[in-house]
Swiss-Prot record:
Propeptide: 1-5
Positions of transmembrane segments: 6-29
Organism field: Dickeya chrysanthemi
NCBIfam families: IV_pilin_GFxxxE, typeII_sec_gspH
GO BP annotation list: protein secretion by the type II secretion system
Function: Component of the type II secretion system required for the energy-dependent secretion of extracellular factors such as proteases and toxins from the periplasm. Part of the pseudopilus tip complex that is critical for the recognition and binding of secretion substrates.
Keyword field: Cell inner membrane, Cell membrane, Membrane, Methylation, Protein transport, Transmembrane, Transmembrane helix, Transport
Family according to the record: Belongs to the GSP H family.
Highest classification ranks of the organism: Bacteria, Pseudomonadati, Pseudomonadota, Gammaproteobacteria, Enterobacterales
Any one Gene Ontology cellular component term annotated for this protein: plasma membrane
Modification after translation, per record: Cleaved by prepilin peptidase. Methylated by prepilin peptidase at the amino group of the N-terminal phenylalanine once the leader sequence is cleaved by prepilin peptidase.
Residues bearing PTM N-methylphenylalanine: F6
Family annotation (Pfam families): N_methyl
Protein name, UniProt field: Type II secretion system protein H
Length: 181
């Protein structure tokens, strides 16, 4: 009677060859880009450009909250205040997280990264009505295409990259980010 199937030795040989092939493929794949500050700045730039375009097309005000290891986009939305002391309805504006389907929000960075933000003094006007310390975002994106001038620097050990928006709304990046974008 003939035996059907494979012997244990044949099966083990196939598993060994598959493992070697998988190892060779993994060694050929480049290191993850998430650890590269230039790649992260290019990602932030793409998100910023999308937010500016969306703000212009949909006529709404957006903002960006910057924290040491993440950034979050927000939308300024009008709310009706119920039960106001007066008989008339009152309106107030609140910042809510903005999460378009095309953007991964919020943008978390690996723990080894650190974000530094500097804005121009007086960039937000005379200081009345806008204050990042009072819950307002650090960067404003207005429907006319205006963006609060700022400089964002990402550091990952000795690796760093920056993005700067000037008073004319032009976006400039470090050479590391331009190569990635």
């Amino acid at each position: 009677m003939r035996q059907r199937g494979f012997t244990l030795l044949e099966i083990m040989l196939v598993v060994l060859l598959a493992g070697v092939a998988a190892t060779l493929v993994m060694m050929a794949i480049p290191a993850p880009k998430q650890q590269d500050s230039g790649w992260q700045i290019a990602r932030f730039k793409a998100q910023l450009q999308y937010a500016v375009e969306d703000s212009q097309m949909n006529d709404h005000i957006l903002g960006i909250y910057i924290q040491p290891h993440r950034w979050q986009y927000a939308l300024l939305q009008r709310q009706v205040v119920e039960n106001s002391p007066e008989e008339q309805q009152r309106l107030r504006y609140v910042w809510i997280p903005w999460q378009p389907y095309r953007m991964s929000v919020p943008s978390e960075l690996p723990d080894s990264f650190h974000i530094e933000l500097s804005t121009q003094v007086g960039a937000a006007g005379d200081g009345t009505g806008f204050s990042p310390g009072n819950g307002d975002p650090h960067v404003l994106i207005l429907p006319g295409g205006e963006v609060t001038p700022f400089r964002l620097t990402l550091r990952n050990g000795n690796d760093s990259a920056w993005l700067q928006v000037d008073t004319n709304g032009q976006v400039h990046t470090s050479p590391e980010a331009e190569q990635k974008g």
